[in-house]
A protein has these predicted regions:
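A generic structural signal for short beta-strands and their flanking turns/coil linkers
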Residues: 20-22, 32-34, 77-83, 94, ...
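Single conserved hydrophobic/aromatic residue that forms the stacking wall/gate
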Residues: 120-131
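Hot-dog-fold acyl-thioester-processing enzymes
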Residues: 42-65
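Non-catalytic linker/capping segments at the edges of enzyme domains
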Residues: 1-37, 42
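Beta-rich strand-turn-strand
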Residues: 88-113, 117-122
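A generic structural micro-feature
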Residues: 16, 50, 75-77, 92, ...
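Hydrophobic beta-strand-centered segment that forms part of the acyl-chain substrate-binding groove
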Residues: 67-97, 102
Length: 131
């Protein structure tokens, strides 16, 4: 299974624009769930030194799409038509865990959930909290 998913990751890295940026690595798959390690390099940061929100959305879009593509055996390439995001706190340059989960799959529409978290906690939340 890991080898099969890594074929899709390699295709995404070689043919996709954002696939070249995030450098995804496989962590875990089970039906309806995918976990990857990705990286936010320096060119994804905003002037404040945190990951630009659109880059976070792009990584979420990628991991959710890759799950659906894999489960459809590569027969579909989905469009994200209604992507909502909530940014609870900033992310910083470095490795992140990206997860995707299928909530409900219909004939033409899939509801999914994606989450991101950094692999480390530096800088400390105290460094960016406003008092």
């Amino acid at each position: 299974m890991k080898e099969e998913i890594e074929k899709y990751l390699a295709f995404h890295k070689n043919k996709g624009g954002s696939g070249k940026i995030f450098n995804f690595k496989f962590i875990e798959y089970r039906e309806g769930f995918l976990k990857l390690k990705g990286s936010f390099p320096a060119n994804t940061l905003n002037p404040a030194g945190t990951v630009q929100g659109g880059q976070m959305n792009s990584m979420l879009d990628d991991v959710t799409s890759l799950l659906l593509i894999y489960e459809a055996d590569g027969t579909i390439y989905p469009n994200s038509t209604n992507l909502h995001s909530i940014h609870h706190r900033p992310l910083f340059e470095g490795d992140a865990i990206a997860t995707a989960e299928i909530i409900k799959k219909g004939k033409n529409i899939v509801n999914m959930r994606g989450e991101l978290c950094l692999l480390y906690t530096s800088p400390s939340p105290r460094d960016w909290m406003v008092s």
